[in-house]
């Protein structure tokens, strides 16, 4: 029996994928949402999302899924399964094979797969992420406001004067003092000093970090190479990310210059592969739930518009 043809295959059951599915519902278009149940950030609370601020992301996903399938809409299918393969066919359609071997076909494809975090090779970092190391101070940090001191890890993508200073000034809204840890990077320390030397609340520490130690709560103990330790209310660091595609494919997607997301043309996020859209974290430089929702909605508009003109051409 031939696989049914959906208007769109949506890969990813997070904020972007669910928002895209809702847009397709509104346009009375059929779609299937593949959700592997593996999500990037295992946090217990989502923030900066109106009406869902400080709510559990699991509860948000449940409510969004219910809205798609148990309310007024009946054109979206939820498939809680990982994919093994996605292939663009000569016809221009997309064919997906899931983990149990079932084949699905769609006229368009929305990737809402998120990203993978590349954990730095710093001892203890993985133990402290994400409970005590924050990549976004709009998503995290408010609950720890008023901390005596917090730290900024100026390593990896933050080993540059602009992001290191930027994150430090944002962190000062939440803490009395801030320490920038350059992890022995003399060149970076020299570049930072002229810009921050007048800030009494900001300290530059150029010693090498030996290890990060998690505590029973949020604070982190930073152990330096000379044997001294300092406890920080939390640490701030944005690690490198790469788009997540855990399946075989022939999509030939182009990466951004930074390699952190797919090239996706605004406003509807179509990739360099016609008919394939990348939305949410895998298609945006700024990665946050509220922006992923908006981006997913726009991707749905792009899909629906293309479908309408495809049908005109026939």
Swiss-Prot record:
Intrachain S-S bonds:
136-139
State any GO BP term from the record: cellular response to toxic substance
Q: Name one GO molecular function term.
A: oxidoreductase activity
Note accompanying the cofactor annotation:
Binds 1 FAD per subunit.
Give the residues the record marks as binding FAD: 13-16, 35-40, 47, 112, 281, 288-289
Give EC number(s), comma-separated: 1.8.1.-
Q: Cofactors per UniProt? A: FAD
Keyword Flavoprotein: yes or no? yes
Annotated keywords:
Disulfide bond, FAD, Flavoprotein, Oxidoreductase
Which pathway does the record list? Mycotoxin biosynthesis
Top EC class of this enzyme: oxidoreductase
Job description of the protein? Thioredoxin reductase; part of the gene cluster that mediates the biosynthesis of aspirochlorine (or antibiotic A30641), an unusual halogenated spiro compound with distinctive antifungal properties due to selective inhibition of protein biosynthesis, and which is also active against bacteria, viruses, and murine tumor cells. The non-ribosomal peptide synthetase (NRPS) aclP is responsible the formation of the diketopiperazine (DKP) core from the condensation of 2 phenylalanine residues.
Q: Which family does it belong to?
A: Belongs to the class-II pyridine nucleotide-disulfide oxidoreductase family.
SUBUNIT field: Homodimer.
Under what name is this protein listed?
A: Thioredoxin reductase aclD
By which gene is this protein encoded? aclD
């Amino acid at each position: 029996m031939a696989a049914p043809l959906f208007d769109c295959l949506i890969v990813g059951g997070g904020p972007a994928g669910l928002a895209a599915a809702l847009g397709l519902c509104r346009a009375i278009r059929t779609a299937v949402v593949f959700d592997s149940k593996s999500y990037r950030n295992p946090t217990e609370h989502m923030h900066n999302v109106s009406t869902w601020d400080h709510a559990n992301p699991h509860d948000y996903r449940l409510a969004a899924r219910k809205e798609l399938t148990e309310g007024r809409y009946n054109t979206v299918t939820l498939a809680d399964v990982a994919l093994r393969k996605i292939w663009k066919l000569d016809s221009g359609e997309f064919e997906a094979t899931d983990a149990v071997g079932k084949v699905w076909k769609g006229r368009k494809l929305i990737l809402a797969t998120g990203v993978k975090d590349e954990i730095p090779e710093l001892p203890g970092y993985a133990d402290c992420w994400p409970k005590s190391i924050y990549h976004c101070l709009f998503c995290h940090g408010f609950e720890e406001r008023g901390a005596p001191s917090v730290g900024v890890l100026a390593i990896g993508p933050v080993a540059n004067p602009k992001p290191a200073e930027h994150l430090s000034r944002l962190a000062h809204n939440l803490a009395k003092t801030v320490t920038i840890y350059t992890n022995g990077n003399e060149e970076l320390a020299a570049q930072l000093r002229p810009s921050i030397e007048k800030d009494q609340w900001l300290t530059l520490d150029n010693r090498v970090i030996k290890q990060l130690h998690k505590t029973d709560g949020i604070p982190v103990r930073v152990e330096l190479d000379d044997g001294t330790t300092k406890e920080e209310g939390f640490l701030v660091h944005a690690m490198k990310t790469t788009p997540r595609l855990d399946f075989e494919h022939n999509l030939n997607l182009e990466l951004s210059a930074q390699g952190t997301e797919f090239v996706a043309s605004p406003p509807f996020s179509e990739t360099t592969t016609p008919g394939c859209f990348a939305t949410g974290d895998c298609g945006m430089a700024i990665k946050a739930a509220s922006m992923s929702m908006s981006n997913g909605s726009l991707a749905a508009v792009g899909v629906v518009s293309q479908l309408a003109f495809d049908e005109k051409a026939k």
